[in-house]
């Protein structure tokens, strides 16, 4: 797979769910390394970015976003089975 980037951020982590991905981007500049997590559709449509200064905080944000989405998916499935 080709290296993915968005607005100068290299995508370094991808968590794919059935209809959406959450990604972690990294960008190194003269002032240091910056991180962002995005929601992503179709490997190219990045939105709802959370911009973060620290790698560990960015990883936590990524996994919290994934967790929130999984909880939402589960609630939708439970509603369908009622």
Predicted regions and their residues:
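General helical secondary-structure elements
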Residues: 6-9, 23, 35, 61
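A short, charged, amphipathic alpha-helix used as a generic interaction element across diverse proteins
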Residues: 51-70
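Short aromatic-glycine-(Arg/Gly/Cys) micro-motifs in beta-strand/loop hairpins
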Residues: 20-49, 65
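Short acidic DE-rich linear segments
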Residues: 75-82
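Negatively charged, low-complexity tracts enriched in Asp/Glu with abundant Ser/Thr
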Residues: 1-16
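Generic detector of short alpha-helix boundary/capping microenvironments
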Residues: 13, 45-47, 71
